[in-house]
Amino acid sequence: MKQEDTNRSTMNIQWYPGHMTKTRRMIEEDVKLVDAVCEILDARIPIASRNPDIDAICGNKPRMIVLNRIDMADPALTKKWAEHFRTKGYAVLQTDCKTKKGISGFVPAVRTLLAEKLARYAEKGQVGRPLKLMVVGIPNVGKSTFINQIAGRKGAKAENRPGVTRGKQWITVDQGLLLLDTPGILWPKFEDPEVGMRLAYTGAVKEDVIDTETLACHFIALLAKYYPQTLSERYKLEAPEGADGYELLQLAGKKRGYLVSGGEVNTERMAKALMDDYRSGKLGKLTLESPEDTQ
């Protein structure tokens, strides 16, 4: 799903606060303490929500991918993504933390992933020695909520604002499994500007790094290409052939009656409404990337 350019310029999205460098160093040290690494991804943007630095940081540690927020993602594409990651050698779990769907499969999946280590513990008479798993993910992929559900607690502060979970903490899941939570970490530069855009669509980067209208223009053009039925159902909009993102935003605003004096469309209001609708799930189950994009 390669997004076509609109006639509105793409802004260069960068967000790498100073604490990110410190966080990376901390993770590089702490990964030595664990048996495996669990990476939480947003099922709507599995490429964009993967930190490309994590592979280098984790080395040869066994890995698990959690495709989170499957309630907001296209089920057919989620299935494709799960198969894609399995063929790459990852254990894969699909979750919706709001309804706890998939959560019960986590501990069994970890034990399967680390079955050889458990067998070695048994051979050494270390039955009961806990497995240690590091949980990583970029800001706002639902990592804290995931950990809360796994551990059955409300201890890891979850907030819909990028970068809110700080510090290091071990969480006891049961007597045989400890989780090491880590702060959300981005990477210094988005090599592909589309990655930055997709992170901005879902709210994984702060809103002040890109103009909302510019973001909405690119997003509505993407909807017109891959999910035209969503535009029709939600905004009563049939996208004219060849219309760019700004024109589509104006048409949607007109349909909504978002007008200012003189009959001009309030595109700023429409842009905010569009992005709010997407982030709250009102546009339905939409996935913005497919495994074919990795080829």
Each predicted region: which residue ranges?
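Glycine-rich phosphate-binding P-loop
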Residues: 132-152, 156, 182
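Canonical P-loop GTPase G-domain recognition
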Residues: 64, 70-136, 155, 257-259, ...
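Alpha-helical scaffold segments in soluble metabolic enzymes
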Residues: 105, 109, 145, 218, ...
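Helix-rich effector regions associated with P-loop NTPase G domains
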Residues: 1-36, 44-53, 57-63, 76, ...
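Anionic group-transfer/hydrolysis microenvironments
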Residues: 41-44, 70, 150, 183
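Short, structured loop/turn "capping" segments at alpha-beta junctions
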Residues: 117-121, 148, 154-160, 226-231
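Short, glycine/charged-enriched secondary-structure capping and boundary segments
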Residues: 52-55, 79-82, 107-109, 148-151, ...
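Conserved active-site beta-strand-loop modules that form the wall/rim of enzyme catalytic pockets
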Residues: 97, 147, 177-180
